[in-house]
A protein has these predicted regions:
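NAD(P)-dependent Rossmann-like dehydrogenase/reductase catalytic/cofactor-binding core
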Residues: 44-113
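Short alpha-helical
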Residues: 8, 24, 77
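Conserved Rossmann-fold dehydrogenase catalytic segment
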Residues: 1-18, 39-44
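N-terminal glycine-rich phosphate-binding loop for ADP-containing cofactors
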Residues: 21-37, 70
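Amphipathic, non-transmembrane alpha-helical scaffold segments
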Residues: 15-18, 22, 94, 98
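Active-site-proximal helix-loop elements at catalytic-domain edges
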Residues: 33-40, 102-106
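Membrane-targeting and insertion segments and their boundary/processing signals
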Residues: 3, 17, 21, 52-56
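Glycine-rich loops and low-complexity Gly/Arg-rich segments
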Residues: 2-3, 25-28, 96
Length: 113
């Protein structure tokens, strides 16, 4: 696609979101697993399976079909429990991205089961 000159910065920001920011999320998740006692290699293996499976599902089926988990189910009790055990940047990122996930869930043709 040809990107208009006045949209190139937005295009680059979108690319950073889909690429570089995912690295930050992965690192935050690995840090939380380390707090749970995971060795770095075990955290890497656990997260790699989740990340690769999710990336494949998104690429093949889109975000609406790929969304699972508490936001997809409208499970606020689980989200609240997650937020209560997180702190700092991890808590804020979780909260902000959960709002995005709720918007994705609202676009589904059929509710998640």
């Amino acid at each position: 696609a040809r990107i208009p000159a006045d949209q190139k910065t937005r295009y680059h920001a979108a690319a950073v979101m889909a690429s570089n920011l995912v690295v930050g999320l992965y690192d935050m998740a690995a840090s939380e697993l380390a707090t749970c006692g995971f060795a770095p290699a075990d955290a890497k293996a656990a997260l790699a399976a989740l990340f690769l499976g999710n990336a494949r599902h998104i690429a093949e089926d889109g975000v609406e079909a790929s969304l699972t988990g508490p936001a997809a189910r409208g499970d606020q009790a689980t989200i609240d429990a997650h937020l209560s055990c997180l702190s700092g940047d991890s808590r804020e990122v979780y909260r902000l991205l959960t709002e995005v996930l709720y918007r994705i869930a609202s676009r589904r043709a059929t509710p998640y089961r």
